[in-house]
């Protein structure tokens, strides 16, 4: 599915589920890594993670579009468009937009660092580096040792 097909799909979803026209752009952004899509407040455009389509198909993209269109229409109407707002929760439930999408990578796949406590030998994996002088084992309070890095 290219950007043109994505645009027409979004316009049809907007009419079908929201009864309003989508008048801005929707496109794939390959730089999105940990999110399925995002609504940009300043330009009113919607960006979609192409990995979601590649891994999970059109159904996943439709769900992401519905979610982002909830942000879009509520923001343009001047209502609460954030996840915590009552208006957002009720609109997303009404149109069947899920709150989250399926992650493209698991935490284990994204982890770059592996640590082990020298006392109880509990292992910890982390995406970001940990300051070993400040951090201790959450289980026994022992000293952590870096085992391996992926970066």
UniProtKB/Swiss-Prot annotation:
* One Pfam entry name: Zn_ribbon_SprT
Arranged from A to Z, the UniProt key words for this protein are:
Cytoplasm, Metal-binding, Zinc
User: How is the cofactor bound, as the UniProt entry phrases it?
Assistant: Binds 1 zinc ion.
Q: Where does Zn(2+) bind?
A: 67, 71
Protein's cellular compartments = Cytoplasm
Major localization class: cytoplasm
- State the Gene Ontology terms under molecular function: zinc ion binding
Q: Does the keyword Cell membrane apply?
A: no
Q: Which InterPro entries match?
A: SprT-like_domain (IPR006640), SprT_Zn_ribbon (IPR035240), Uncharacterised_SprT-like (IPR023524)
Q: Which residues form the SprT-like domain?
A: 7-146
Looking up HAMAP family in the UniProt record yields: SprT_like
- State the name under which the record lists this protein: Protein SprT-like
Q: Which organism is it from?
A: Staphylococcus epidermidis (strain ATCC 35984 / DSM 28319 / BCRC 17069 / CCUG 31568 / BM 3577 / RP62A)
